[in-house]
Amino acid sequence: MQKRVFNVLLVASRYDAFIMEEDGRVEEQIYFEYVSLNLSSPPRVKQVTTNEEAFEELAMKRYDLIITMPGVDCSETFTQAKAMKRLYPYIPIVVLTPFSHEVSRRIAKEDLSGVDYVFSWLGNVDLLVAIIKLIEDKMNAEVDITSVGVQLILLVEDSIRFYSSILPHLYNFVLKQSQIFSTEALNEHERMLRMRGRPKVMLARTYEEAMQIYEKYSGNMLGIISDVSFIRAGVKDKKAGIKFCSYVRSCDPYLPLIIESSEWENHKDAIRLNASFLDKNSKKLPVDLRKTILKNFGFGDFTFINPHTGEPIVTIKNLKDLQDNIDIIPDESLYYHASRNHISR
């Protein structure tokens, strides 16, 4: 990972800043979250309360990410974001809004060309860490995935509130699994390399965006989590996710797919595509998602099974375990897992 987010400019009114800092200063909250996840180099956060102050800061200092919170006038925020993007096209800009149906309706009518992402602030600093990691993953995807061979998890979702809720859970899971994997490292340097070699996470909000990412990185795709209804060819398509997953399945019969939807009838398509199905209405969706990823995306211990009965043969925790047990693993089990890319995950 060559590019990192070191300096964040947060543009928020005094009221919004007060709401965000109920549990302490934003920079301190991010620092403690980084420490809990065993991450290095937490970013520094500079807070300003007006757009004028923001432009002054940008003129004096280099920033790697701009997060802006709209006040009463939502349109003004997006207008100023476009002005910032014209002057600093290389800086990602994220709009962080309080969630309400009224705000969602207003955002749907706005010109979003000046912003990279819109997120809903749900009161948890986990979201800020997820935003920073999402930006870093996007900045480093070209080199880390194409040249180094790092794997990718693709989330396809257009609901601002939903991806704002699920991304922190997804990153928390991936980072903690990487922590477990890094404990096998021989030294501190190798441990850090393993942490930085974790799977990338990328977010697509339209059919075309999902197709572009898949076509570019299909050889390194670890798994896909997709909604069903989102924009395709400029209009809302209630089956866009099914069409996308059908294309993916025609290219790769074994890639793990998770289809999530608030409409139960879509589970029939998931069965047809040999994909897992998650109900977005479930109160334990984050737990269900974590269990499904752990089971299907190759995290955790590896269990060789009998391909005919599904019964477990042996569970492998590390390379030493594999060396010790390779002789008792039947050829047909080894072939079953290898031919489906289970081992390479």
Specify the residue positions occupied by each region the protein language model found.
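As written
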Residues: 107-118, 269-278
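Polyanion-binding and phosphate-handling cores
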Residues: 242, 246-252, 265-297
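Short, charged/polar "capping" segments at the starts of alpha-helices
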Residues: 17-20, 101-105, 163-164, 265-268
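Conserved phosphotransfer microenvironments
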Residues: 19-26, 40-42, 47-59, 63-93, ...
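Hydrophobic/aromatic residues positioned on beta-strands within the core alpha/beta folds
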Residues: 96-98, 259-260, 280
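Non-catalytic signal-transmission and effector/linker regions of two-component phosphorelay proteins
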Residues: 1-46, 82, 110-117, 121-200, ...
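Amphipathic alpha-helical packing elements
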Residues: 335-345
